[in-house]
Amino acid sequence: MAKVGITELAIRDAHQSLHATRMTTADMLPICDKLDKVGYKYIEGWGGATYDSCIRFLNEDPWERLRKLHAALPNNKIMMLLRAQNLLGYKHYADDVVEKFVATAAKNGIGCFRIFDACNDPRNMECATKAAKKSGVDVQMAISYAVTPFHTNEKYAELAKTYADFGADSICIKDMSGLLKPYEAFDLVQKIKAKVDLPIEIHSHATTGLSVATLLKAAEAGADWLDTAISSMSMGTSHSPTETVVEMLKGTDMDTGLD
């Protein structure tokens, strides 16, 4: 086991989960100076429903938000959640649109693309992944976690191997429903680690109350990075509190080292 990194979700997935993505750019900017000094692996700040919400509900330019966050977080890489061929919309887009969108996002401040397909179909992820690799920033490919007779840890590990072959820089286990149990997480991380030599990040919502224990067991199994949200933006349908996870690992060989 080694030092664990933390991705902070407060200004993207946390408010998307708790407040229907209604946090404005003006709400975010005052805290950015403090966030920038904490020492996170990534700060997730764009993508998901934020693009739609900016335009549909907040009367904001999502690209201007990205540029402002990039300027306000000079010491951090901003992560975005990208729906692969769907980009940030609700249908498949042409390859040339995907390529241009990804290049423009990288140019405006994205430092890591977390790319997922809800069907876990690598064919839907190939174009976005190639475009992200070409942009020169970090590329994380996500496994959408589900519990069915078909979705076994062995199949997820094989999927991770496919992602590695695509050129992923890291793998995310994306548990968007909070269904990943602690000991299942331990087994899943170990199985993926046996297949690929890449960092693994755990994204697990707190909806079912399992997430804190799940993050701990995943870290014990060798997960490299964990997704959390500042306590005021945590729990419920959001994520485990950053402060709780940092304190939980403090003094161990998994110590995050965060202030």
Predicted regions and their residues:
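Catalytic cores and adjacent flexible loops of soluble metabolic enzymes
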Residues: 1-114, 118-259
